[in-house]
Regions:
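Charged, low-complexity interaction regions
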Residues: 22-34
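Amphipathic alpha-helical coiled-coil segments
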Residues: 40-54
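Short amphipathic alpha-helical heptad-repeat segments
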Residues: 2-20, 36-40
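N-terminal targeting/docking segments
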Residues: 1-10, 30, 48-52
Length: 54
């Protein structure tokens, strides 16, 4: 798997998480919102690290 593939995967995951979050918010599922936010933060940090290598 190339660096570009990993970057694309991180971007796709962030896009997916950003689509999931509004549903969790509207349902009032604060635990799910917190999990989504935590996963988004980890994914963004990984993406930032990958971009410094690119």
């Amino acid at each position: 798997m190339s660096l570009d593939d990993l970057i694309a995967m991180c971007r796709a995951k962030l896009a997916h998480l950003s689509q999931l979050r509004p549903s969790a918010v509207s349902l009032g599922d604060t635990e799910q919102v917190e999990r989504i936010d935590a996963e988004a933060i980890k994914t963004q940090q990984t993406l930032n690290q990958l971009l410094t290598l690119a």
